[in-house]
Amino acid sequence: MSYLTILLGIILVNNYVLAQFLGICPFLGVSKKLDSAVGMGIAVIFVMVLATAATWPIMKVLDIFGIGYLQTIVFILIIAALVQFVEMALKKFIPSLHKALGVFLPLITTNCAVLGVCITNIDEKYTYLESLVNSFGAGVGFLLAMVIFSGMRAKIDDNPAVPKAFQGSPIVLVTAALLSLAFMGFGGLV
């Protein structure tokens, strides 16, 4: 499988947020402001690629020792450690982004999209490089979904044209569903 096919497939066709419905919590929670959405997306890309770089070889070691059943626990521990590293780096080098992300930054630890991409790389039997490309593409797809949705929310949040019964969470969920449907149009691309 070519790297371009993997990238296009995971960004547009099998987008973790819009097609596989993983990572919904930060998708809905951090998409109110564009700068926070971009910051979260970049942090997720970074964590996904680092998590894949660490978990892929560790899974090979787990398989050698016949303890592959520990995969999920080990992956969660690795992801948690990486998120702590990212949080410390952001706090030191980009404090404004650290403050903007707030409670959602530690939630990357429990972002099922990060764990999902690590497990998918193993399940799909990707090589190490294919796994890195897939995780990068998954992060870019997450960022793309966040940026598009953030732009949509800027138009609908506090919009007086939205009926009272739909204001707040209902219109946000309807908008997310419509965005997901729009991405289904890429289904035959790859």
Give each language-model segment a name.
Residues L8-A43:
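Juxtamembrane transmembrane-helix termini in multi-pass membrane transport proteins
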Residues F21-G29, M88-F93, V103-L107, C112-K125:
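Generic transmembrane alpha-helix signature in multi-pass membrane proteins
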Residues Y3-L18, G66-A81, V133-A145:
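Structural signature of hydrophobic alpha-helical transmembrane segments
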Residues I6, V13, V44, V49, ...:
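Hydrophobic core segments of alpha-helical transmembrane domains in multi-pass membrane transport
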Residues D35-F46, L70-F75, L97-T109, K164-P170:
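Cytoplasmic-side transmembrane-helix entry/capping segments in multi-pass membrane proteins
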Residues M1-T5, P57-L70, I119-L132, G187-V190:
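Helix-coil boundary and interhelical linker segments in multi-pass alpha-helical membrane proteins
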Residues A154-L173:
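Interfacial loop-to-transmembrane junctions
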Residues P57-G102:
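Ordered, amphipathic secondary-structure segments that act as subunit-interaction surfaces
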